[in-house]
Amino acid sequence: MRKNYLSSNGGIYMKISMHDNILFAKVGWMKRYDGLDGDNIKGGGSYIDKHNIGWEIYNFSDENGIYYGYVTYQGCIDIHKNFNAKLNNNFVDNVNVVWVAKNPDGSGMKIVGWYKNARVYKHYVNPPKNTKRYKNNYKKIFEYNIEANVSDSKLLSIDERNFNIPNAKNDGYGMGRANVWYCNGDKNKKLKEN
């Protein structure tokens, strides 16, 4: 059975099944996620607050038809428990990744975009040498942990970012404080069904 994420104005965000592998990834708020030229990053944690940069700045930078995405986490992304990956696998394919960020205007956590049919890595990996994540003005190598085809992905414009992600503490279901969330459990079925 296919379901949709709907915006408040009735636009379709992403068709999913309740049985699809879903990962919500919390990042800092940006307009384009294609570097900092003409854009900036707001929120997203203490590192961003201190340095005005985060590894997610290139999450929607088209690198020969591929997006290389980054979300920070403690330990590793648990692909074995949450996506039934084999124990010797370092990645899992066909995960729908929903990128979310806290709107700086105070209106809450919003969907900013998604990758469908993504590859999710258990640990951070180094980017290919011919990408902005590898060669950039910041003299840093920006690791990534999620990749997807550009054709299977969507970055929402600021005006399209109107779907609120429920807050587990306030709403009794939804995303908590962690940057990675798997939308598991009976209480969270509400979110998959909306």
Task: Say what each PLM segment does.
Residues 1-13:
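N-terminal amphipathic/basic-hydrophobic helices that include classical n-h-c signal peptides
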Residues 10-57, 125-194:
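Contiguous surface segments at macromolecular interaction interfaces
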Residues 43-158:
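Structured alpha/beta reader/binder surfaces that contact nucleic acids or chromatin modification marks
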